[in-house]
Each structure stands twice: as structure tokens, then as C-alpha cells.
Amino acid sequence: MKFFIPSHKRSNLLMKYTLGCLINYGIKKDDIFIFVDFSQEEEYKKICGEHANIIGFNDTGIGSARYYIQLFAQDKQIEYGFILDDDLQVLLYKSEKAPKGWWHNKYIKDAETAQKYLSKMEDDCLARSEILVGLTPRRVMHLDKPDVFSNGHPYGFYWLNFKKLKDLDIWYDHNMDHFEDYDITFQLLETGYNTKLYRDLGFSSFVIGTLEGGCYNNYQTKDLLSKARMLELRYQNIGVKLIEREIKNKSGQNNLSFKIKWIKKKSILQQEDFLGSITKKVVD
């Protein structure tokens, strides 16, 4: 099992959190790859190089790290692995005693338990011949069944296979929100349209949102808009409209959420509730 960690000017934080976590769980250096801009390569080698492989690349902004990780994995013939944020603190797993439909998570504190669950995930991945991608903005990584879309937890960890999406029933009635990782979100949009997956399942909208950070960053917002326009130009029969929405959280603060709605060129889809029944309300 390989671990890919894109990072930017946070070598000390990475060493304290994600890398420290992986070290505690007994993950070896050969399985950890940290991706940083060429200008930061020496700094990361000094702070983290003893425990991880530091890979320099030309960081051009949002999405470039994960795109480069994909190229790197293809070149090294690595078929699966985790992509982690650099502030990961702990692994979680679903309690076997949890009632059906409930998600009682337990913290993994020791290396033996971590290795047990990571090994199971690796076996599941091999059995499905899929690519494993993890996104962990809430500083935890869920180790749940790979056929479950982190139900009930919008900041979960999940499995994607861009070549062939299997077990389509898992996409029904699940939150299609995607947080922070806009590049993969748009890959999903393209993959979904190309395979008619989302259209066949009745998806007429897609949500990109965040409760912390993310969309508050202006250049990320502009990047979303430019990608939306790019998609609109790419497909002659379908357009993409990006709609900004504010959500009040429990503390009364505004959170930005972005909705992408597929729009037919001659007949705009009429749907008052753009999110419909396929999404859950995003709250703290």
C-alpha cells in the first residue's frame, strides 16, 4: 500500500501530523511519497526525508499535485494507493459492534491494528482492481468497507475508479458533495458524463462545498469558474452553470457552497431544489 502526500510550505506540520501518524503505524519509507514544488524540495528532504521519499515537481496551482501523482503512479506502475492531506492525525475504523445503519468509529492507536485494517483495504482493492483515492480534510481517515460511500459522514474517505465505476447502486441516495479537491471533482463530472452514469442515475446537479477554507480562497473560486467554462466549451450538447450559495452554520457564520447544474442548451432543466434528494444538508 502506497501513500501519496501533496504538500505546500508545511514541512513541519506534515512531519507532526500525517507523516508522524504513518510512522507510528509502522509504515515504511518505501511506501510514503511526498510531492512538493521543486523550490521546496530541499527543505522537505531536511525535515521529512528520513521517513519519506520527497518528489519534486512543477507546482502550478490547484490540482497539479494530484495530476502529477497520477502520472507518477502510472510511470511506476503503482495500481493503488492513498492520497492524504498533510494534516492527518488519526485513522478510524467502523466498529463491528455498531448497529446496522450506524457509524460508530473507533480510533486506531497502535501499529498492529492499523496494519490489520490497511492490509484488509489492500486486499479489497486488489480484488476489485480499483484505484484507491483518499481525501481527509477533517484530519481523520476512515477505514470502512470499500463499497460504502462514507454514509452519514460528509468528510469521509472513499474509493473511486475513473476507468470503470462498479457497483452503481452505492451511488444512490448518497451525498455527492465533494470537499476541497476540485480537480478530482471535475474528473468525476467528466467521467460521469462520458459514461452517462450520473445522467442515467438522475443526477441533474453536483455540489462542491466546504465548511472550512477551500472556497474562501479567491483563486480557488476562480479556478472553479474557469474549469466550469472549460467543460461548457468541451461539450456541445450540455452546459455547466456554477451557482454560489451561502449556508448558515450553527455558530451563525456563512459558509460558501458551489452548485454545478447540468444545463441542456435548448431546454434548461427545471428543478427548484437543485440539490434534490441526492444530497444531504451541509451543516457543522
Language-model features and meaning:
Residues 91-182:
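Conserved catalytic core of nucleotide-sugar-dependent glycosyltransferases
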Residues 8-13, 41, 88-91, 109, ...:
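Short acidic, S/G/P-rich loop/turn micro-motifs used as interaction or catalytic elements
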Residues 35-84, 89-104:
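Active-site-proximal specificity loops/subdomain of glycosyltransferases
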Residues 2-26, 40-45:
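Short, well-formed alpha-helical segments that are part of the catalytic scaffolds
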Residues 15-17, 43-47, 92-95, 143-148, ...:
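A short acidic (Asp/Glu
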Residues 1-2, 23-34, 52:
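Short loop->beta transition adjacent to catalytic acidic/histidine clusters or analogous donor-positioning motifs
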Residues 34, 80-84, 131-136, 195-199, ...:
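A structural signal for short, well-ordered beta-strand segments and their strand-loop junctions
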Residues 1, 10-14, 176-178, 182-284:
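C-terminal catalytic/acceptor-binding lobe
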